[in-house]
Amino acid sequence: MKFIKGFDKLSNYCKILVFLSLFLVLILIFKTPKREGYEQLEKYVMKKGDDIYDELYSDIYDLLVYNDLKNDYEITKIVDKTGVGNDSVFLDVGSGTGHHVKLLSDKGLKVTGIDKSSAMVKKAHTNFPDCKFVTGDVLNTDVFNNGSFTHITCMYFSIYYLHDRHQFFNNCMEWLKPGGFLIVHLVNPDKFDPILPPGNPLQIVSAQKYAKERITTTKITFNEFVYTSNFNLNKQNNTATFEEKFKFNNGKIRKQEQLLHMDSLEVIANEAKDAGFVLRNKINLVGCAYVFQYLYIFSRE
């Protein structure tokens, strides 16, 4: 009762601050990720490249990067800007745990997801058993027949993990039907926010806006371990390393290092044009709070 009486005496401004504080506490409580079922046997593990995408990473991946509002925004914009019909057939490159495939499928569209990681494909099948996922390398021209798709999507940094983008763009040109669309997620390497979503509970407000220097680290406390990551951009050779560390409660440690080929927006767009694509549109993802990130829409003539 004393609290209620005291609260009633507060100004409207102070009441708003109290509610915001309680709201932030609730966000932090409910957004603390939970994961079960994995036990690392070795005291120390170091993984690089494709080896990273194993059972643990496929299990934890959604907790680190999944954002349903962003995914909905992207798919809605893609459908609106490219147009779809009964004859539309989608391929989602780097489909991961399957969420973009599921959203497209829910719209009644034919869609296949492809990923190099068998663990990620297995997780996608578990998440969405009615959707189609295959394990394969998109740098292999023979993985699909010519003219198989009307749309190819390459979402959430997938383009940056490819060591031969020229081959990828040439393959997409072959796999697309005439008039088909290639949609690629691209970022401004110098300005996008590398903090993972759980590391920024509010999400709608970027910490970068108020930081004197770019924040490149993320730290998240899980039930079983503490997760940290850091994004290191090398402007000299247009690459970046994404370093991750899992420190388990039992003292065991797992480290990971991923290499990204982080050329500028213009360079990658020109590579697509060199393969014969025409840039038709750009979707700015600031509309879903992903600043300096875009969907470039190319078409095959």
Regions found by a protein language model. Give the residues of each.
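SAM-dependent methyltransferase
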Residues: V184-V267
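Class I SAM-dependent methyltransferase SAM/SAH-binding core
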Residues: G98-N140
